[in-house]
Protein backbone atom coordinates (compact mmCIF):
# COMPACT_ATOMS: atom_id res chain seq x y z
CA UNK A 1 0.00 0.00 0.00
CA UNK A 2 1.09 3.56 -0.74
CA UNK A 3 0.03 6.39 1.55
CA UNK A 4 0.60 10.00 0.57
CA UNK A 5 -0.12 12.56 3.26
CA UNK A 6 -0.27 16.36 3.21
CA UNK A 7 1.87 16.97 0.12
CA UNK A 8 2.60 20.66 -0.43
CA UNK A 9 4.65 22.26 -3.19
CA UNK A 10 5.30 25.90 -4.02
CA UNK A 11 7.12 27.49 -6.94
CA UNK A 12 7.90 30.98 -5.69
CA UNK A 13 4.62 32.47 -4.54
CA UNK A 14 2.56 29.94 -6.50
CA UNK A 15 1.16 27.23 -4.20
CA UNK A 16 0.87 24.34 -6.68
CA UNK A 17 -0.08 21.53 -4.27
CA UNK A 18 -2.09 22.30 -1.16
CA UNK A 19 -2.07 19.30 1.14
CA UNK A 20 -2.73 16.29 -1.11
CA UNK A 21 -3.70 13.00 0.57
CA UNK A 22 -4.08 9.73 -1.32
CA UNK A 23 -4.04 6.01 -0.49
CA UNK A 24 -3.34 3.45 -3.22
CA UNK A 25 -3.62 -0.27 -2.53
CA UNK A 26 -1.45 -2.88 -4.20
CA UNK A 27 -2.88 -3.72 -7.63
CA UNK A 28 -5.02 -0.59 -7.88
CA UNK A 29 -5.16 1.69 -10.89
CA UNK A 30 -5.64 5.33 -9.91
CA UNK A 31 -6.21 7.88 -12.65
CA UNK A 32 -5.79 11.60 -12.01
CA UNK A 33 -7.80 13.94 -14.20
CA UNK A 34 -8.29 17.68 -14.24
CA UNK A 35 -7.60 20.85 -16.20
CA UNK A 36 -4.13 21.93 -17.26
CA UNK A 37 -2.32 23.70 -14.45
CA UNK A 38 -4.19 21.88 -11.70
CA UNK A 39 -1.03 20.30 -10.22
CA UNK A 40 -1.47 16.77 -11.57
CA UNK A 41 1.98 16.37 -13.09
CA UNK A 42 3.71 18.11 -10.20
CA UNK A 43 2.01 15.74 -7.79
CA UNK A 44 3.06 12.71 -9.82
CA UNK A 45 6.67 13.93 -9.96
CA UNK A 46 6.62 14.42 -6.20
CA UNK A 47 5.88 10.73 -5.71
CA UNK A 48 9.40 9.71 -6.71
CA UNK A 49 10.96 13.01 -5.66
CA UNK A 50 11.74 14.24 -9.15
CA UNK A 51 10.09 17.29 -7.61
CA UNK A 52 10.89 17.76 -3.93
CA UNK A 53 7.74 18.55 -1.93
CA UNK A 54 7.99 21.35 0.60
CA UNK A 55 6.05 19.24 3.06
CA UNK A 56 4.47 15.81 3.26
CA UNK A 57 4.91 12.10 3.93
CA UNK A 58 5.14 9.18 1.49
CA UNK A 59 4.83 5.64 2.85
CA UNK A 60 5.48 2.49 0.82
CA UNK A 61 5.74 -0.97 2.41
CA UNK A 62 5.52 0.69 5.85
CA UNK A 63 8.69 2.69 5.13
CA UNK A 64 7.92 6.32 5.92
CA UNK A 65 9.74 9.12 4.10
CA UNK A 66 9.57 12.73 5.21
CA UNK A 67 9.56 14.50 1.84
CA UNK A 68 10.89 17.73 3.28
CA UNK A 69 14.13 16.20 4.55
CA UNK A 70 14.73 12.89 2.75
CA UNK A 71 18.18 11.36 2.94
CA UNK A 72 20.01 10.37 -0.26
CA UNK A 73 19.46 6.76 0.73
CA UNK A 74 15.70 7.32 1.05
CA UNK A 75 15.53 9.09 -2.33
CA UNK A 76 17.40 6.22 -3.97
CA UNK A 77 15.17 3.65 -2.26
CA UNK A 78 11.95 5.42 -3.29
CA UNK A 79 13.05 5.69 -6.91
CA UNK A 80 13.78 1.98 -6.97
CA UNK A 81 10.15 1.30 -6.00
CA UNK A 82 8.73 3.48 -8.77
CA UNK A 83 9.15 3.98 -12.51
CA UNK A 84 7.98 6.97 -14.52
CA UNK A 85 6.64 7.01 -18.07
CA UNK A 86 7.10 10.57 -19.30
CA UNK A 87 4.90 12.60 -21.63
CA UNK A 88 7.90 13.55 -23.79
CA UNK A 89 9.49 10.04 -23.77
CA UNK A 90 12.92 11.14 -22.41
CA UNK A 91 14.86 8.62 -24.51
CA UNK A 92 18.60 8.89 -25.13
CA UNK A 93 18.92 9.94 -28.77
CA UNK A 94 22.39 8.38 -29.16
CA UNK A 95 21.32 4.98 -27.79
CA UNK A 96 19.38 2.26 -29.58
CA UNK A 97 15.96 1.12 -28.43
CA UNK A 98 17.32 -1.83 -26.49
CA UNK A 99 20.14 0.26 -24.99
CA UNK A 100 17.56 2.75 -23.71
CA UNK A 101 15.68 -0.03 -21.95
CA UNK A 102 18.88 -1.60 -20.60
CA UNK A 103 20.13 1.69 -19.12
CA UNK A 104 18.23 1.51 -15.83
CA UNK A 105 19.09 -2.15 -15.40
CA UNK A 106 22.83 -1.77 -15.84
CA UNK A 107 23.25 1.60 -14.11
CA UNK A 108 20.67 1.64 -11.30
CA UNK A 109 20.22 -2.10 -10.76
CA UNK A 110 23.87 -3.06 -11.48
CA UNK A 111 22.74 -5.93 -13.70
CA UNK A 112 25.18 -7.67 -16.02
CA UNK A 113 24.80 -6.53 -19.64
CA UNK A 114 23.95 -10.02 -20.83
CA UNK A 115 21.14 -10.34 -18.28
CA UNK A 116 19.94 -6.78 -18.90
CA UNK A 117 19.75 -7.48 -22.63
CA UNK A 118 17.53 -10.52 -22.04
CA UNK A 119 15.18 -8.56 -19.75
CA UNK A 120 15.02 -5.59 -22.12
CA UNK A 121 14.36 -7.81 -25.14
CA UNK A 122 11.51 -9.52 -23.30
CA UNK A 123 9.86 -6.23 -22.30
CA UNK A 124 10.19 -4.83 -25.81
CA UNK A 125 8.52 -7.95 -27.15
CA UNK A 126 5.59 -7.32 -24.78
CA UNK A 127 5.05 -3.85 -26.22
CA UNK A 128 5.37 -5.06 -29.82
CA UNK A 129 8.81 -3.64 -30.61
CA UNK A 130 10.83 -6.82 -31.03
CA UNK A 131 11.72 -5.70 -34.55
CA UNK A 132 13.06 -2.31 -33.40
CA UNK A 133 15.78 -3.37 -30.94
CA UNK A 134 18.60 -1.71 -32.87
CA UNK A 135 16.69 1.31 -34.12
CA UNK A 136 17.37 4.80 -32.77
CA UNK A 137 14.66 7.11 -31.37
CA UNK A 138 14.87 9.33 -34.46
CA UNK A 139 13.71 6.36 -36.53
CA UNK A 140 10.56 5.77 -34.45
CA UNK A 141 7.06 7.22 -34.45
CA UNK A 142 5.79 8.97 -31.33
CA UNK A 143 3.75 5.92 -30.39
CA UNK A 144 6.78 3.66 -30.74
CA UNK A 145 8.90 6.02 -28.63
CA UNK A 146 6.30 5.93 -25.88
CA UNK A 147 6.18 2.14 -26.02
CA UNK A 148 9.96 2.13 -25.52
CA UNK A 149 9.39 4.35 -22.48
CA UNK A 150 6.84 1.89 -21.13
CA UNK A 151 9.18 -1.06 -21.72
CA UNK A 152 11.95 0.82 -19.91
CA UNK A 153 9.67 1.36 -16.91
CA UNK A 154 8.48 -2.26 -16.87
CA UNK A 155 12.02 -3.63 -17.12
CA UNK A 156 12.98 -2.59 -13.59
CA UNK A 157 9.90 -4.32 -12.14
CA UNK A 158 8.80 -1.39 -9.97
CA UNK A 159 6.17 -1.65 -7.28
CA UNK A 160 4.39 1.39 -8.72
CA UNK A 161 4.16 2.60 -12.32
CA UNK A 162 3.72 6.36 -12.74
CA UNK A 163 2.36 7.62 -16.07
CA UNK A 164 2.50 11.34 -16.84
CA UNK A 165 -0.03 12.00 -19.62
CA UNK A 166 1.56 9.29 -21.79
CA UNK A 167 -0.58 10.07 -24.85
CA UNK A 168 -0.59 13.87 -24.67
CA UNK A 169 2.32 14.37 -27.10
CA UNK A 170 1.06 11.83 -29.64
CA UNK A 171 -0.66 12.24 -32.97
CA UNK A 172 -4.33 11.25 -32.40
CA UNK A 173 -3.90 8.24 -34.70
CA UNK A 174 -1.14 6.87 -32.46
CA UNK A 175 -2.92 7.21 -29.12
CA UNK A 176 -4.70 3.86 -29.45
CA UNK A 177 -1.52 1.77 -29.70
CA UNK A 178 -0.18 3.19 -26.44
CA UNK A 179 -3.50 2.80 -24.61
CA UNK A 180 -3.68 -0.84 -25.75
CA UNK A 181 -0.27 -1.52 -24.20
CA UNK A 182 -1.41 0.16 -20.99
CA UNK A 183 -4.58 -1.94 -20.95
CA UNK A 184 -2.45 -5.08 -21.09
CA UNK A 185 -0.41 -3.82 -18.13
CA UNK A 186 -3.62 -3.20 -16.18
CA UNK A 187 -4.59 -6.84 -16.74
CA UNK A 188 -1.35 -8.00 -15.08
CA UNK A 189 -2.45 -6.48 -11.77
CA UNK A 190 0.18 -3.74 -11.75
CA UNK A 191 -0.17 -0.82 -9.36
CA UNK A 192 -0.51 2.28 -11.53
CA UNK A 193 -0.99 6.01 -10.96
CA UNK A 194 -1.87 7.67 -14.26
CA UNK A 195 -2.25 11.36 -15.06
CA UNK A 196 -4.42 11.43 -18.17
CA UNK A 197 -6.80 13.39 -20.37
CA UNK A 198 -8.17 10.14 -21.83
CA UNK A 199 -11.54 10.02 -20.08
CA UNK A 200 -12.71 6.74 -21.60
CA UNK A 201 -9.49 5.03 -20.54
CA UNK A 202 -9.85 6.41 -17.01
CA UNK A 203 -13.43 5.22 -16.79
CA UNK A 204 -12.65 1.73 -18.08
CA UNK A 205 -9.57 0.83 -16.05
CA UNK A 206 -9.65 2.77 -12.79
CA UNK A 207 -10.25 1.59 -9.28
CA UNK A 208 -10.15 5.23 -8.22
CA UNK A 209 -10.56 8.40 -10.26
CA UNK A 210 -9.13 11.57 -8.71
CA UNK A 211 -10.20 14.99 -9.99
CA UNK A 212 -7.75 17.77 -9.18
CA UNK A 213 -8.10 21.51 -9.61
CA UNK A 214 -6.00 24.40 -8.30
CA UNK A 215 -3.71 22.15 -6.30
CA UNK A 216 -6.33 20.20 -4.37
CA UNK A 217 -8.31 17.00 -4.79
CA UNK A 218 -11.83 18.21 -5.49
CA UNK A 219 -13.43 14.78 -5.82
CA UNK A 220 -12.41 11.14 -5.87
CA UNK A 221 -14.17 7.82 -6.06
CA UNK A 222 -14.91 4.91 -8.36
CA UNK A 223 -15.47 5.66 -12.06
CA UNK A 224 -19.19 5.22 -11.47
CA UNK A 225 -19.14 7.74 -8.62
CA UNK A 226 -17.05 10.36 -10.41
CA UNK A 227 -18.41 10.07 -13.95
CA UNK A 228 -22.04 9.11 -13.32
CA UNK A 229 -22.87 10.33 -9.82
CA UNK A 230 -20.73 13.44 -9.63
CA UNK A 231 -21.05 15.32 -6.35
CA UNK A 232 -19.05 18.50 -6.95
CA UNK A 233 -20.10 21.27 -9.33
CA UNK A 234 -16.49 21.87 -10.41
CA UNK A 235 -16.07 18.22 -11.41
CA UNK A 236 -19.36 18.27 -13.30
CA UNK A 237 -18.33 21.46 -15.12
CA UNK A 238 -15.03 19.89 -16.17
CA UNK A 239 -16.64 16.66 -17.39
CA UNK A 240 -19.28 18.49 -19.39
CA UNK A 241 -16.57 20.39 -21.21
CA UNK A 242 -14.23 17.50 -21.96
CA UNK A 243 -16.50 14.47 -22.11
CA UNK A 244 -20.23 15.14 -21.77
CA UNK A 245 -21.27 11.61 -22.73
CA UNK A 246 -19.97 10.16 -19.47
CA UNK A 247 -22.60 11.95 -17.43
CA UNK A 248 -25.34 10.15 -19.33
CA UNK A 249 -24.14 6.97 -21.06
CA UNK A 250 -22.76 4.05 -19.04
CA UNK A 251 -19.96 2.11 -20.75
CA UNK A 252 -18.19 -1.12 -19.98
CA UNK A 253 -15.77 -1.06 -17.05
CA UNK A 254 -13.06 -3.68 -17.56
CA UNK A 255 -11.06 -3.45 -14.33
CA UNK A 256 -11.74 -6.05 -11.64
CA UNK A 257 -11.86 -4.35 -8.22
CA UNK A 258 -8.94 -4.86 -5.85
CA UNK A 259 -10.09 -6.83 -2.81
UniProtKB/Swiss-Prot annotation:
Main localization of the protein described in the UniProt heading: membrane
GO molecular function, one term: ABC-type amino acid transporter activity
Subcellular location: Cell membrane
Assigned GO CC terms: plasma membrane
Subunit structure: The complex is composed of two ATP-binding proteins (TcyN), two transmembrane proteins (TcyL and TcyM) and two solute-binding proteins (TcyJ and TcyK).
Physiological role: Part of the ABC transporter complex TcyJKLMN involved in L-cystine import. Responsible for energy coupling to the transport system. Is also involved in cystathionine, djenkolate, and S-methylcysteine transport.
Protein name in the entry: L-cystine import ATP-binding protein TcyN
The organism of origin for this protein: Bacillus subtilis (strain 168)
Amino acid sequence: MIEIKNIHKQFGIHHVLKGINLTVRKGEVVTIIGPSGSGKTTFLRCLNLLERPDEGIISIHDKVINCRFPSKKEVHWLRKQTAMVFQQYHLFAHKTVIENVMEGLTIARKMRKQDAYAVAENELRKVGLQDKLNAYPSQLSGGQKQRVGIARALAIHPDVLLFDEPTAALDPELVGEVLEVMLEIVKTGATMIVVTHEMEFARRVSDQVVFMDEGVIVEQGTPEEVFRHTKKDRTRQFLRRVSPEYLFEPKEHIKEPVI
